[in-house]
Amino acid sequence: MTTPYKHEPFTNFGIEENRKAFEKALETVNNEWLGQSYPLVIDGERYETENKIVSINPANKEEVVGTVSKATQDHAEKAIQAAAKAFETWRYTDPEERAAVLFRAVAKVRRKKHEFSALLVKEAGKPWNEADADTAEAIDFMEYYARQMIELAKGKPVNSREGERNQYVYTPTGVTVVIPPWNFLFAIMAGTTVAPIVTGNTVVLKPASAAPVIAAKFVEVLEESGLPKGVVNFVPGSGAEVGDYLVDHPKTSIITFTGSREVGTRIFERAAKVQPGQTHLKQVIAEMGGKDTVVVDEDCDIELAAQSIFTSAFGFAGQKCSAGSRAVVHEKVYDEVLKRVIEITESKKVGEPDSADVYMGPVIDQASFNKIMDYIEIGKEEGRLVSGGKGDDSKGYFIEPTIFADLDPKARLMQEEIFGPVVAFSKVSSFDEALEVANNTEYGLTGAVITKNRDHINRAKQEFHVGNLYFNRNCTGAIVGYHPFGGFKMSGTDSKAGGPDYLALHMQAKTISEMF
């Protein structure tokens, strides 16, 4: 009998004991974890390759977090074959035994929770609170999905007639290719890996090239937790060479992808083509980003509105698909809200996230830095720069939290996903107009409405077309089991990660009817 699910609590770093524990974890990671080399893992065997992926600290380009062997198409083929072979036994493993692997993995991660979070500080430049939340979410995914599988194994009730027994059960699907992002490098990577595993599928994991070390560490945890060889296969590599090969392979049954719209739609298109020897249609589970809006009504709490915009825009330097990169504010409170957001933003510290007092660290790499700085130049032409706007990539990839005012709703800064610390303000004259602007992008992931008007809340519930809608809070920070996460429109397939329907996406429903 398992205990009821409850999300992993966040660490309060205002408590000195917790601060010291995390400082010790950072020291451990610096002295013992950094600079290691990690092989491919295929069918339980280790493969070292000549070509490597080098993971660096985005806050300090001179610091190597680790090197990871880089897979070729030959390795990808071996991984698919190993996963297909392991599927023939893993699919029949008792669901409670599969769930037990996740519970053991959770215990191992919890024992080194601060060390894993400290690794995220190094590999992704996450501030302490963001890193701690990422690790907590990874724990939550394992805890939640393990419990969900135990329930799902019972099947669903259907009607039976006299002399007839009918069952509706779920069966595993097959080989799952998992392509996670670099931003939630532990949480999403872990969640999208263990969901197919616990449902009886096998996995080929191709981690993000910008953050492969945490994935290598997690594969070690799964192996130490009793996961049989071949159930998860670790093949970091380029998207063009390895990613496409895995997506196209006739033995691939499911592709789970989190990342950009461009790559996601390409995967969706490639997966739809039936390859020679393929005996099934591939399932694609995709989350492809957002252009998310915080709507501020005229009847609102000004401080709450400002804090919500700030948190939504600049948490983890805006490198979240859920980030509130658009603030659509009623003209009656526009100036006051904008002024307060600027004040909050300019009071926060930006720098290397090794220190507890740093609110915002670097962006992930040079390509991201260049892209964001290009968008800042576009913003200077489209709107009014009121805070930030400078970048410094001399040591790490640092960009000031940047605020633009007076944007046209159809401006590029209001339409295109930037994935950086940039928020654009647009003024509206009514709640009708606010909803119209909120819905005017091709995305539909998250949104928030700050208002005291109950009628407007009820309207937004119906008319604000996003997968995750929040009222009187920020539009980021979904909790597994509490806020199932996934978007509408071009934000993806609305596969709600951390929700009651998610595991079923990895399985096939089977009807069994027996006469007696």
Swiss-Prot record:
EC numbers on record: 1.2.1.88
Q: What SUPFAM superfamilies does its record include? A: ALDH-like (SSF53720)
Gene3D superfamilies according to UniProt: Aldehyde Dehydrogenase, Chain A, domain 1 (3.40.605.10), Aldehyde Dehydrogenase, Chain A, domain 2 (3.40.309.10)
Q: Name one GO biological process term.
A: glutamate biosynthetic process
A Pfam family (short name) is: Aldedh
Q: What's a single GO MF annotation on this record?
A: 1-pyrroline-5-carboxylate dehydrogenase activity
Its pathway, per UniProt, is: Amino-acid degradation; L-proline degradation into L-glutamate; L-glutamate from L-proline: step 2/2
Question: Which key words are in the record?
Answer: NAD, Oxidoreductase
Q: Which superkingdom does the taxonomy of this entry point to? A: Bacteria
Tell me which InterPro entries the record gives: Ald_DH/histidinol_DH, Ald_DH_C, Ald_DH_CS_CYS, Ald_DH_CS_GLU, Ald_DH_N, Aldehyde_DH_dom, Proline_metab_enzyme, RocA
Which PROSITE patterns would you find in this protein's record?
Answer: ALDEHYDE_DEHYDR_CYS, ALDEHYDE_DEHYDR_GLU
Q: Which residues form the active site?
A: 287, 321
Keyword Cell inner membrane present in the record's keywords: the answer is no
The reactions it catalyses are:
L-glutamate 5-semialdehyde + NAD(+) + H2O = L-glutamate + NADH + 2 H(+)
Q: Which GO terms describe its cellular component?
A: cytoplasmic side of plasma membrane
In terms of NCBIfam families, this protein maps to:
D1pyr5carbox2, PRK03137.1
Identify its protein family: Belongs to the aldehyde dehydrogenase family. RocA subfamily.
| Name of the protein in question | 1-pyrroline-5-carboxylate dehydrogenase
Q: Which gene encodes it?
A: rocA
